[in-house]
């Protein structure tokens, strides 16, 4: 086992604080509308330019192992805030730095760290309660746009795209971010349920100009097995032909004579048919077939539940207003499924999301919810260079997470104002069990001014003057660093999602509390490469007699 280096008490805390400050100082320059960029060197390719706090934090690794421990703990704050709310990483880092700096000063002055931590925890709990009271729901498209704009570092076009996407696919819909092909940002919306399976034969195409199959008011046959024998399909085909409507077959596969017969019938115009493979694999395929069945008011023909394809009737078939199929995707628009059943299915999948421990499974389940609940929107990010594309894509993803958080828990005044108002309301009733807890409460409440001070400092203004003016104001009164004006933050469109502000504060206080109560630090001693080399050479002394 390698030898260890141990530091105690003040020696340990000084080293840890140095690491905290290096990381936080690099991250906090990105905060606010006038935050600066940070350039990150990559081992290959062009450097990355970013204003995303968590991206900066992830890159930092310090040479001194004790300092690095401090830096890694603050990195954890940024990562946790990012995982919980998708934004607020810089705010969380600034708060953690402020609480640690104030807390360690108090410890150095002889205060009991455990009582300080209890005081900090009391202050944070009270402020979180006040934040929830200050929060107002984020419902209008304008508010969603404002939240998106702020989170994308005041890029109003991104805010507009996100608001439009949410309007089109609903609050539950899937919105993804992809690389665009031009210089402009674009929004691409797929309404209805889309899955990644195309037509099984190009002979089904009835719109040659777009190379797609379009079926109006089709019946939809859902089969949980391979179809290779046409005899199994004949009763359904005859019934559909009599009804005079097109038919979409979704099965595990359609092959051999069954596929050939369908193609011939389609080309002769006897019955309009298209066949696609069912989406997914294994159990997920069964679940997705069931989703389509509920969406289209059909039944999955499955031998597992004793149903046979030959005995299927028109009542077993689903229906939709329109189906569009290209070589890669199938889109079912306006299925006739019962609204209550669809909502029940969505609730059931949501329950599975809650219980799932795998991120991959959660993502796939979330996609299923979106396909049932609304649709899919793709924001295509345009940029002149690859470096700009990466930076912009990061910002768009941040903005998307922030708007989801705003819809979930509501919004509060931005620009650090909500924390100051919540802190001043909480201060009136907060009382610790002893004087040292009171010190913890006061230092935590004082640290809550730090995001506002940092935003102002990054804008090149005097932080103390602005902080004093904002503290003397009421309600949503604050300072807009972008325009350098005072006023009502919500009226000016400077909003923060409550969840982002709350998560940033809770994670910052949690890690900061652990740091303040640290009394010893242990790390491996660095290996001396010279000694290792000498030891290796020493083993060769007996070679002199070989001549």
From Swiss-Prot:
Location within or outside the cell: Cytoplasm
EC identifiers of the protein: 5.6.1.7
Top-level EC class: isomerase
Catalytic activity, reaction form: ATP + H2O + a folded polypeptide = ADP + phosphate + an unfolded polypeptide
Binding site for ATP: 30-33, 51, 87-91, 415, 496
GO biological process entries: protein refolding
GO molecular function: ATP binding; ATP-dependent protein folding chaperone; isomerase activity; unfolded protein binding
One cellular component (GO) term of this entry: cytoplasm
Keyword ATP-binding: yes
Key words of the record: ATP-binding, Chaperone, Cytoplasm, Isomerase, Nucleotide-binding
Task of the protein: Together with its co-chaperonin GroES, plays an essential role in assisting protein folding. The GroEL-GroES system forms a nano-cage that allows encapsulation of the non-native substrate proteins and provides a physical environment optimized to promote and accelerate protein folding.
Subunit structure: Forms a cylinder of 14 subunits composed of two heptameric rings stacked back-to-back. Interacts with the co-chaperonin GroES.
HAMAP family to which the protein is assigned, alphabetical: CH60
NCBIfam families cross-referenced by the UniProt entry: GroEL, PRK00013.1, PRK12849.1, PRK12850.1, PRK12851.1
The protein's name in its UniProt record: Chaperonin GroEL
Source organism of the structure: Mannheimia succiniciproducens (strain KCTC 0769BP / MBEL55E)
